[in-house]
Each structure stands twice: as C-alpha cells, then as structure tokens.
Amino acid sequence: MSKKIPFVTKEQLEKIVSQYPTPFHLYDEAGIRRTARLVNKAFSWNKGFKEYFAVKATPNPYLLQILREEGCGADCSSYTELQMSDAVGFKESEIMFSSNATPAEDFKLARKLNVTINLDDITHIDFLEKVADIPETVCCRYNPGGHFAIANNIMDNPGDAKYGMTHEQIIEAYKILKSKGVKNFGIHAFLASNTVTNEYYPELARILFELAVELKEKTGAHISFINLSGGIGIAYKPEQQDNDVLAIGEGVRKVFEELLVPAGMGDVKLFTELGRYMLAPNGALVTTAIHQKHIYKEYIGCDACAANLMRPAIYGSYHHITVMGKENAPCDHKYDVTGGLCENNDKFAVDRMLPEINIGDLLFIHDAGAHGFSMGYNYNGKLRSAELLLQEDGSVKMIRRAETPADYFATFDFGEYGPKLAEEAKIKM
C-alpha cells in the first residue's frame, strides 16, 4: 500500500500551532501552483484552453489569487462567488457563471460583470432576457440522460440529475439564442463526480464533441468553446491510483482530432472546471486529540468536528489521517475519531486502524483542501476555524481568521437581544 505523506512536518506544524490554535485548514501554495501548471501542460495542445477553478470548492480570495497568477479563471455559481472573483481581479471572460434555479439578482450581476453565462435550462433564456439581456456569447448545459458508463462500469446517473437540458432542448435553445443575436456558443456538461479513471474526460469529450458537430450542422451556430466541467477526482485512499492528468489530456486530444478537426472545428477552445483535483490534495484539516473515551469502542475526541469537514458525516467519505510524528509507528489500534457535535455521525473515521493516539497528538486529515471549509456550518453553535497558507518560502500566512462569538451573533444586530449578545461575545474565559 502506498503512503499518504503530509506536505508539512511535525516540527513545522508544532511551530504553526504555537501561533494559531487548532483546528485550522492548512493549504500548500507550492502544491497548488504545481497542480495548476500540470493541468495547463496537459491541455497545452489546445490554444484556447483555460481552467476555471470551481470557486465553490474553496472560496478564499488568497487562494483564488494564486490560481489567477497561474492563468486560471473562476467558475462561479452564486452572487457572492461572483463578487469574490471580481474583487480578486478576474474579469469578464475569465469568469464562467454556472448556476441552476438562478435568482434574478444573480443573472443581473453576471450581466453587469459581463461574465460568460452557462444556462442550465431552456426556460432561462426568457428569464435572462426579462431580468437583464441576452449577451453575444452564451453557453448551454447539456444532460444526455440515462446512465453514464465507462467500459460497462456505471459512473453516475445523469438522468436523475437536476442539471442541464435534454438533447432536443439544447438544439432548440441554440436556435432561439441564435435568433436573439447570440454569435458565440459554448457547450457544458457534468456527468460524474470524483472519477478516478483516466477515461472520464475522453468519454465525456466524445459525447460533447459529437453534440457540437450536430449542433453546428442543425443550427448553424458557431461553437466557440466546449467546457468539460469538473469530475476529475483524487485518490482519497492510499491504495487508490491517482489520475494521470497528462494521460487524460492526451486522451482528449485524440478525440478532438478524431471528431472536431475533420468537421472544421479545430479552433474550438476547451475549458475545464476542476475544484477537487486542484485543491483537495493541497489542503488539510489539522486538529488536536483532546479526549479519549473507552466504552464499547475506543474513541478519540478532537477539537475539530463535522462543522469543519462535513464529507465523512454526510457522505461516509474516507479521509486519510496521519498522526503527526507517528508516521512509521504500527497501526495497531482501532479507533473512531470523532468531533464534539451532538450527532453520532460526527466521525472523521470509524473503526480506523491507527497508531496509538495520545491526548495532545496532532492529527493531519488529508485531502481537505476542497469541499472542506466551504461546506462548514454553525450547527451546535460551532465556530468555523481559520484558514492558513503554507507559502513557498516556508512561512505561514493567515488567509481567513477563525470565527468568534461576535461573528456568530452578528446577524442579531437589531432589537433587544443585539446589545446583550454583543456583551456576551466580549467575555473572555
């Protein structure tokens, strides 16, 4: 079995903890830049290629700035994600707006910023025209329905997903949009999540490239770009094989040359919207073991909880755990590693074989750089933790402070309880 190795040493982490108390999310700048460059290299054969980082995965302006410096754009799905991306400096075509059940205010802001809009439904054409206007460049999201399979292995069930247009709808949508003055069209689809296979993108590309040729023939539309969206996953478990993004890029190139080039569409730009692949391995949740409990099972209680990393609780997802300083110790103790929420599913690991854990040990929970902090919440009155960046020079920078009681009570800044709660928030233990 291969090993997952933390991107920080025990000595480094102890120094960080002396300044920033656990729990916190820690990100690796060098790893983020390395991953971005690898993705750009994998698709460098396509002159118009651009990776649009899925902001929903890790919405932090400091991290977005790193990705912007590496040539990435921003994939936004909400009003505030648009605002954050604009504040960082992403402009117009550097932002892709992909949303569903979209509020009018979101569309209005997207048009004000002149970003590329990806329409989720054919009815959104009239809705967008009513609340704003129809731009010259529009993308449409496609859902082929049925089950999506690779080599007879079902990857996901698009037919049960709420996203995208049917085959008939997207053809009709192109005709309508063209009649309303749209000059440049894009196609987008997301058919499977967290795939750990080099075949996903090439198979998705085949579906979208064939659709692009058909749309050109049936509507006369100019297909400017095709967005392969996300779905490229990571190996959360040590025994899993990582995706080879260079092989993935080469696989897409072969399909591109097979289908689009002969159709006179060799100038089509390719986009991706990778969130998990870009950030998950380059981030971790760091927590301290603060309690041991010996009942019917052995429990290790941490100062982090599902409010800091929700995936194990709601999806049963595996996140590898390294007990810092005990990387080479035998994994001969079986633990449930838990947080302090009043929910029995608040567990980072169940029946996990780990080295003996003592109170005060630092636990490095791997692959929490995406869908970690971003899915946090305040149930049980828990406060969201800080986010820190391990910079390339080895220094550490706080890129989001930890929440305080004052933050938690901030939305009661009216009426009789506002002043009382503000006073409570000032009390220091």
Can you describe what each PLM-predicted range is?
Residues 1-117, 122-136, 175-179, 183, ...:
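A charged N-terminal "starter" segment
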Residues 32, 56, 78, 110, ...:
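Conserved, mostly hydrophobic/aromatic
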Residues 57-59, 80, 101-103, 121-123, ...:
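Active-site-proximal loop/turn and secondary-structure-junction residues that shape catalytic pockets
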Residues 73, 96, 116-118, 139-141, ...:
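Structured core elements
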Residues 133-147:
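Glycine-rich, aromatic-flanked loop segments that form ligand/cofactor-binding clefts
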Residues 144-290:
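Active-site loop/helix belt of alpha/beta enzymes
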Residues 257-261, 265-429:
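Charged (often Lys/Glu-rich) extended helix/loop segments that serve as interaction or gating elements
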